[in-house]
């Protein structure tokens, strides 16, 4: 089985590799640089989902893969939170028939100073967090979640949960009409 990932970010590519390998066994994962078609910092569920779907579709279109996978993180409004926003990773999986399945991982809040920079300066959360901890490659490694959880959950693991959730209908095709 061949799986194309609409990203070259190791935290995304390895998450896809590990989940697909665990479910399907032998799998070839091909990272493909694509344009998400949404702002670098998506805001709102619609924008975030659109980014994940665009990544998945472009990945499969540019290859002969069986599946295209897109992962997009974005902020969305949540009442009663400290900042008013939470971050969530959405995953889209598209197959050769064009069927799309979606999933997302756990949501979490960024520090208020990071959210302020996003909305006042237009800075992407990954960049703002990288600057906060003096690591410009943070989003390609443990991610903000790795810093915020003191290493208890890293970005790859967060992405793996989103990928697994997007595969739930494919693991149970008879219940989802696939």
Swiss-Prot record:
Residues engaged in binding substrate: 7-12, 64-65
Cofactor(s) it depends on: Mg(2+); Mn(2+)
Details of cofactor binding: Binds 1 divalent metal cation per subunit; can use either Mg(2+) or Mn(2+).
Gene3D superfamilies for the chain: 3.90.950.10
GO molecular function, one term: ITPase activity
Superkingdom to which the source organism belongs: Archaea
Reaction equations catalysed: XTP + H2O = XDP + phosphate + H(+); ITP + H2O = IDP + phosphate + H(+)
Residues annotated as binding Mg(2+): 35, 64
One of the protein's GO biological processes: nucleotide metabolic process
Function statement: Phosphatase that hydrolyzes non-canonical purine nucleotides such as XTP and ITP to their respective diphosphate derivatives. Probably excludes non-canonical purines from DNA/RNA precursor pool, thus preventing their incorporation into DNA/RNA and avoiding chromosomal lesions.
Family per record: Belongs to the YjjX NTPase family.
Annotated protein name in UniProt: Probable inosine/xanthosine triphosphatase
